[in-house]
Amino acid sequence: MHLVPLPALLDNYIWLLHDDDGNAIVVDPGDAGVVEHALAARQLRLRAILLTHHHHDHIGGAAELHGQHAAPVYAPDDERIEAATVRVHDGDTIELASPRVRFDVIAIPGHTLSHLAYVGAGLLLCGDTLFSLGCGRLFEGSPAQMLASLDRLSSLPGEILVCGGHEYTETNGRFAHTIEPENPELHQRLQEVSALRAQLRPTLPIALARELATNPFLRVDTDAVAAWCRQHGIDSDRVARFAAVRAAKDEFC
């Protein structure tokens, strides 16, 4: 399976997966034109569309693509996603014959209440829940819900590749540095990110193990993040620590 991040809109990624026989899947197609161009350039046939949540920058092109290609649209059970043809839920499995791939569906509420992730082919397609060096804003869910969702993702194999929905890594990295300025693995990641963005190259996908070593939202149980929280008057449970770091990020940018 080949993975291609398609830049779209302001800073979104539409994820394109395809096999050697020309069969393709797209994830969170906010812009149908970007997908059509990529399919034509690679001579691919669109076989399925996966949606993680209802925000327009992730679903805006789904209806048009379904109309053009008759590809099923897998989506959360959320009436705000009108383009859905197959509603999926936590614990479901999606099995496709062309391309031959299987995805496990995981509910990860927080950014939105009906947010889903798709796990398969060595990939974590996680929309706006987990970014490199960051996580999504809590538009609908609570800090406890978001932390529980991130815990679920953190338990996945370390080699799985995180495919978030936006190119936010530089800004996220600057914030992460304020939380853990002495983290050597974070320093290395920031150097890599700077070099990649200087060449206009994506900073995703990234192995989950590297996020576990550098992403402050996955590290609320570490001594370093706990120390930062104590410096800011938070000496409580892990949900409070997560909420404090998320609030600080909201004020950071």
Task: List the predicted regions and their residue ranges.
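Accessory terminal helices/loops
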Residues: 151-161, 170-253
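Active-site metal-binding loops of divalent metal-dependent hydrolases
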Residues: 29-31, 54, 78-79, 111-112, ...
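Conserved beta-strand hairpin/beta-sheet module of binuclear metal-dependent hydrolase folds
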Residues: 1-44, 116-131
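Active-site HxH/HxHxD metal-binding segment of metal-dependent hydrolases
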Residues: 9-10, 24, 31-106, 192
